[in-house]
Amino acid sequence: MVVPESFQLDQEILLDAGAQLHRLKMYPYFDVAHYLLMIIEVRDDLGSAASIFSRKHPLSCWLSSMLMCFADAFLANFLLGEPVIAPFKRHDDIILATIIWYLVFYAPFDGIYKIAKITPVKCVLAVMKEVKRAYKVSHGVSHAAKLYPNSYIVQVLVGTAKGAGSGIVRTLEQLVRGVWLPTHNELLRPSFATKACVVAASVLALEKSGTYLTAPHDLVYLVIVGFFVYFKLSAVILHVTDPFAPIENLFCAIFMGGIWDAVSRALAASRDRRAAGAHSNENGSSISTPEKKDQ
């Protein structure tokens, strides 16, 4: 099938779009969307006790919110052996995040919180947050590649930490609020955001090496942003929780012992049926023998 030239996407247009997207400044608009959604997650995790907790324990509430807002930088610095407190060196970011924290928890009639929960507003915030997520993953991989140019695993770990650090730091954030749930952490039950960041960081690490992936960086970055935005909107609008689940189930069934476990269960069930059949035959013969004697 021949596609008309009017419908063909020029590669230069895609590269220019990727370059423009890559050069977007995150401060303040994209940072506002990120801070707002992170602090809303803290409030949602508190549930109905959010209002009482924020008034009784404002310091704990503020600290847990800041941990979520800057979790990516905390975790990446920890992995690279850099000062963990470094995210607090920019007072502009702290002031902006604190203002948003105050509006989410203390605005009259919960106005900011309720507005952010409206679906169109939530979609816009989600798109902006995913653009920032792609930006952080890209910069995390680039920073790690400068320090460890021959280590793909370090680049992927740092890129994932920059993009999905909030899920991993959540256990510490809950501990600050007096909640200890060690069985509910991102390493045991990784969210789709963490899995997507692993995939994106792996692609960017391969693209950085130039050995296995030779596509232009701006084009790769544009595809990653589209990947993040598409699945985030699918989760918000269509409630698609984890698109990777079918692939994971198939992979585990083939390579993680799923097939052999199923065969073992089938053999065990077959043995149980044979044993039950033999036992019923023995009971039938023992019952028929006394009847013959009575006759």
Curated annotation (Swiss-Prot):
It is found in: Endoplasmic reticulum membrane. GO terms for molecular function: identical protein binding; potassium channel activity. It is a multi-pass membrane protein. Pfam families: TRIC (PF05197). Keywords: Endoplasmic reticulum, Ion channel, Ion transport, Membrane, Potassium, Potassium channel, Potassium transport, Transmembrane, Transmembrane helix, Transport. A 1,2-diacyl-sn-glycero-3-phospho-(1D-myo-inositol-4,5-bisphosphate) binds at residues 129, 133, 166. Residues 46-56, 108-119, 178-188, 240-295 are cytoplasmic. The keyword NAD does not apply. Residues 274-295 are annotated as: Disordered. One of its GO terms (cellular component) is endoplasmic reticulum membrane. The chain crosses the membrane at residues 28-45, 57-80, 90-107, 120-148, 151-177, 189-210, 216-239. Residues 1-27, 81-89, 149-150, 211-215 are lumenal. Its main location: endoplasmic reticulum. Belongs to the TMEM38 family. Potassium channel that mediates transmembrane potassium transport. Might be required for maintenance of rapid intracellular calcium release. May act as a counter-ion channel that functions in synchronization with calcium release from intracellular stores. Binds phosphatidylinositol 4,5-bisphosphate (PIP2). Homotrimer; trimerization probably requires binding to phosphatidylinositol 4,5-bisphosphate (PIP2). This is Trimeric intracellular cation channel type 1B.1. It comes from Caenorhabditis elegans.
